[in-house]
Amino acid sequence: MVTIRLRRTGKTKKPSYRLVVADSRAPRDGRFIEIVGHYNPVRQPKELNVKADRVRYWLGVGAQPSETVVRLLKQVGVLDADGKPAPVTPIEG
């Protein structure tokens, strides 16, 4: 099974994380398929960048996000309050 989860990076006592798509059997910091964002909880305000189009693609093909990633994706607006993909609004112009 493919999961979207956090991969720890950064220094000792100063963690930052990458949102990665990985096989569920791979170690936390091991091999991954694609980087779809990053999260830095140490900075104030907390920094969160997500490639929303790639996350929607992976969710569409069956990737399962971890509980923490679900919470972060709700903050960004990729998932709605129920944890389902939010509708995409077309950009006019």
Swiss-Prot record:
HAMAP family linked to this entry: Ribosomal_bS16
Keyword Nucleotide-binding among UniProt keywords: no
Keywords for this protein: Ribonucleoprotein, Ribosomal protein
Disulfide bonds: none
Family recorded in the similarity comment: Belongs to the bacterial ribosomal protein bS16 family.
Biological processes, Gene Ontology terms: translation
Any GO MF annotation of the entry: structural constituent of ribosome
Organism whose genome encodes this protein: Roseiflexus castenholzii (strain DSM 13941 / HLO8)
Protein name per Swiss-Prot or TrEMBL: Small ribosomal subunit protein bS16
Pfam families membership: Ribosomal_S16
Keyword NAD: no
Any one GO CC term of the record: small ribosomal subunit
